[in-house]
């Protein structure tokens, strides 16, 4: 047993070492840690494999299915940019980074859970399209209320929790500016403690998967792909259920690719700290900027979903409510705007980093330098005194030896 373990372990370390050497030799990858780039390129590889399999199936079954499959994949890419996806993934990533369980694959598990609803719905639709279509409106209404309620509640809770975190980060930056304190402590009020206990519930992949599944009960994604499946069954009589399953599968991998990229890049942005002489300030600085954008986005989308839930239960006619309906029909535009806001915030942070770094340099550093000089001088004096004492001791010993020799 021991000999085998001693043999396997060096092989494993050697493999990891070779992989790291190969990875960091690639110019455009060396700036990203493997924890960020590996999930993204893994999903790119999965998409390529799925499309190869889909091409084989389409060529064997019916080549006219290609456009429908391509449309399903495009719908997955588009739906991944929906505002509730982007906001939930970004806020969950930020919350997990403030714990001891940070994850760069929040978007992956969230989109897989979300797409599971699509897959189950398409199987039911493909098996019982004629009977299920008559009752589809009831399922859509009930699922819309459940999914929107859960999404709204989670986003508002995430917004409140990240607001608490934003206050805490601002307090730490103020303490650092005032006295140079770099310990992450200070805000330990009742609300902060309650929010920490609440968000500890979402601390593992399967819990994020469940959240994505519940979000999917809104049936917005299921409507697109399932109606596509019904239309395909109507147009292509005799198409097998296995061919119909291509639609939710390509939808899943397309949506998972975009959400994984978003989650991994936000993980990198939130955990970013420059390799400068002051990484503590850089970490606080970028965290405050991105957390502020996350709070604004979460509150905005949560309030919009609350208003959408009200109008779905009690329809109303006015310019405001009609505009809200048009906004809900173009949800991917809102998600794209949120992504753009994060990009602009990141560019602003990079461009203004040096300015704020100089402004927030704690004046206590000068005092510390003076204290260091005093300590060095004290050490020199102590060394001098020790040397003088040792010299005195050596001279006394020498004298004693001389006296002994004279007596002898």
Curated annotation (Swiss-Prot):
<comment type="function">
    <text>High-affinity nickel transporter responsible for nickel uptake. Required for urease biosynthesis.</text>
</comment>
<dbReference type="Pfam" id="PF03824">
    <property type="entry name" value="NicO"/>
</dbReference>
<dbReference type="GO" id="GO:0098716">
    <property type="term" value="P:nickel cation import across plasma membrane"/>
</dbReference>
<keyword id="KW-0256">Endoplasmic reticulum</keyword>
<dbReference type="GO" id="GO:0005886">
    <property type="term" value="C:plasma membrane"/>
</dbReference>
<protein>
    <recommendedName>
        <fullName>High-affinity nickel transport protein nic1</fullName>
    </recommendedName>
</protein>
<feature type="transmembrane region" description="Helical">
    <location>
        <begin position="238"/>
        <end position="258"/>
    </location>
</feature>
<comment type="similarity">
    <text>Belongs to the NiCoT transporter (TC 2.A.52) family.</text>
</comment>
<feature type="transmembrane region" description="Helical">
    <location>
        <begin position="288"/>
        <end position="308"/>
    </location>
</feature>
<feature type="transmembrane region" description="Helical">
    <location>
        <begin position="333"/>
        <end position="353"/>
    </location>
</feature>
<keyword id="KW-0813">Transport</keyword>
<dbReference type="InterPro" id="IPR004688">
    <property type="entry name" value="Ni/Co_transpt"/>
</dbReference>
<dbReference type="InterPro" id="IPR011541">
    <property type="entry name" value="Ni/Co_transpt_high_affinity"/>
</dbReference>
<feature type="transmembrane region" description="Helical">
    <location>
        <begin position="141"/>
        <end position="161"/>
    </location>
</feature>
<feature type="transmembrane region" description="Helical">
    <location>
        <begin position="210"/>
        <end position="230"/>
    </location>
</feature>
<feature type="transmembrane region" description="Helical">
    <location>
        <begin position="106"/>
        <end position="126"/>
    </location>
</feature>
<keyword id="KW-0472">Membrane</keyword>
<feature type="transmembrane region" description="Helical">
    <location>
        <begin position="38"/>
        <end position="58"/>
    </location>
</feature>
<keyword id="KW-0812">Transmembrane</keyword>
<keyword id="KW-0533">Nickel</keyword>
<keyword id="KW-1133">Transmembrane helix</keyword>
<dbReference type="GO" id="GO:0005789">
    <property type="term" value="C:endoplasmic reticulum membrane"/>
</dbReference>
<dbReference type="GO" id="GO:0044750">
    <property type="term" value="F:high-affinity nickel cation transmembrane transporter activity"/>
</dbReference>
């Amino acid at each position: 047993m021991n000999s085998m373990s001693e043999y396997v372990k060096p092989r494993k370390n050697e493999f990891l070492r070779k992989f790291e050497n190969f990875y960091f030799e690639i110019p455009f990858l060396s700036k990203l840690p493997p924890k960020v780039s590996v999930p993204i390129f893994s999903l790119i590889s999965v998409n390529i494999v799925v499309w190869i399999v889909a091409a084989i199936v389409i060529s064997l079954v019916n080549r006219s299915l290609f456009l429908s499959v391509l449309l399903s994949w495009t719908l997955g890419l588009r739906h991944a940019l929906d505002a509730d996806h982007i906001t939930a993934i970004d806020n969950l990533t930020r919350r997990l980074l403030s714990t001891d369980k940070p994850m760069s694959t929040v978007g992956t598990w969230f989109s897989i859970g979300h797409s599971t609803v699509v897959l189950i719905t398409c199987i039911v639709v493909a098996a019982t399209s004629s009977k299920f279509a008559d009752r589809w409106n009831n399922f859509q209404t009930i699922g819309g209320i459940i999914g929107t309620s859960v999404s709204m509640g989670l986003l508002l809770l995430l917004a409140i929790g990240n607001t608490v975190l934003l206050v805490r980060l601002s307090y730490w930056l103020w303490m650092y500016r005032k006295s140079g304190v770099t310990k992450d402590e200070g805000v330990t009020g009742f609300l902060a403690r309650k929010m920490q206990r609440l968000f500890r519930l979402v601390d593992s992949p399967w819990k994020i998967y469940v959240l994505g599944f519940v979000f999917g009960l809104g049936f917005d994604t299921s409507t697109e792909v399932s109606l596509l499946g019904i239309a395909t069954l109507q147009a292509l009589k005799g198409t097998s259920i296995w061919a119909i399953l291509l639609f939710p599968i390509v939808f899943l991998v397309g949506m998972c690719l975009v959400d994984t990229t978003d989650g991994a890049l936000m993980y990198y942005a939130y955990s970013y700290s420059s390799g400068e002489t002051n990484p503590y300030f850089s970490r606080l600085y970028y965290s405050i900027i991105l957390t502020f954008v996350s709070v604004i986005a979460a509150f905005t989308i949560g309030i919009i979903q609350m208003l959408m839930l009200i109008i779905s239960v009690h329809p109303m006619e006015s310019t405001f409510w009609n505009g809200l309906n048009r906004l809900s029909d173009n949800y991917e535009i809102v998600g794209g705007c949120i992504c753009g806001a994060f990009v602009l915030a990141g560019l602003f942070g990079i461009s203004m980093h040096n300015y704020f770094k100089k402004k927030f340099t704690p004046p206590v550093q000068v005092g510390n330098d003076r204290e260091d000089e005093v300590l060095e001088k004290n050490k020199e004096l102590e060394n001098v005194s020790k040397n003088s004492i040792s010299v005195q001791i050596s001279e006394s010993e020498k004298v004693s030896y001389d006296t002994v020799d004279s007596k002898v």
